[in-house]
């Protein structure tokens, strides 16, 4: 979905940062992916409706990914109880991580271009 409004360079930058700040996970392994977008969104949500939408989308996706990761962890744990389940558990974990990284990068690029981005499999907690 393309946004038809004229966006300033600052709006595009902060829209991109809403998504890209999820990479804070690599600095703060415990929920850095949630705190990064949350901080950017809270700072800029009242200054631009578009940045507000991008921040909500990014934050909802990161919260969704935490839930999916917890579910995957339990599934992986159960699978590792069987010898054949270990490779499948590794594939599940890697698949989820790759999906997350690709989605964050795609959203960041789209936002930097001034386009709205909707994450797949996103649970919309914040509307």
Placement of each model-derived feature along the sequence:
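Short hydrophobic membrane-inserting alpha-helices and related fusion/pore-forming segments
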Residues: 25-33, 74-91
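Generic alpha-helical transmembrane segments of integral inner-membrane proteins
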Residues: 38, 42, 67-74, 78, ...
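Hydrophobic alpha-helical transmembrane segments and immediately flanking/interface helices
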Residues: 86-110
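Membrane-interface extramembranous regions at the lipid-water interface
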Residues: 1-65, 104-127
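Charged, glycine-enriched surface loops/patches
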Residues: 62, 69, 84-87
